[in-house]
């Protein structure tokens, strides 16, 4: 079993009632179909750690080996995840990142954007009910961060009724009724 990490995953805002912040958080929760504000704070903490690392590297000299090595590693990581564009591979652009850039790379958002779900909330339900796979692996975590090279492999799971697996409850019932020849067993789907 892996050792447990006791570091915090989200940073609670210092001031609980700031109208501007509350409005912006609520907008993000609604737009990206998040469960609660903690999911926003988790992304903001990740963003602040990345920006802090970039700020520290920018204080060093441009030819400093630490800045060159760690800066390139940070930028490469962000490009691979798809948060940073390949045309903007500089530390200055890392400082300009916003929470929306990270929220766009969540599996939930991408399932909706690819048209596999009717709404952002439907996307979350599909993921939690194990209907979505990335590559060959079923992923049931809506906050899963999808890499750029994995994005084209997002699809319905093979075991899912949506992906050609075992038919759902209503379809099985209709098939059984049609097989038996009973015309009175008519029921609406869903």
Swiss-Prot record:
Residues 181-190 have a biased composition (Acidic residues). Signal peptide: none annotated. The keyword Ribonucleoprotein applies. The keyword Ribosomal protein applies. Gene3D superfamilies: RNA-binding S4 domain (3.10.290.10). SUPFAM superfamilies: Alpha-L RNA-binding motif (SSF55174). CDD domains: S4. Residues 105-181 form the S4 RNA-binding domain. GO terms for cellular component: cytosolic small ribosomal subunit. GO terms for biological process: ribosomal small subunit biogenesis; translation. Keywords: Ribonucleoprotein, Ribosomal protein, RNA-binding, rRNA-binding. One of its GO terms (molecular function) is rRNA binding. It comes from the Eukaryota. Residues 163-190 are annotated as: Disordered. InterPro entries: Ribosomal_uS4, Ribosomal_uS4_CS, Ribosomal_uS4_euk/arc, Ribosomal_uS4_N, S4_RNA-bd, S4_RNA-bd_sf. It holds the Pfam family S4. Belongs to the universal ribosomal protein uS4 family. NCBIfam families: PRK04051.1, uS4_arch. PANTHER family: 30S 40S RIBOSOMAL PROTEIN, 40S RIBOSOMAL PROTEIN S9. This is Small ribosomal subunit protein uS4.
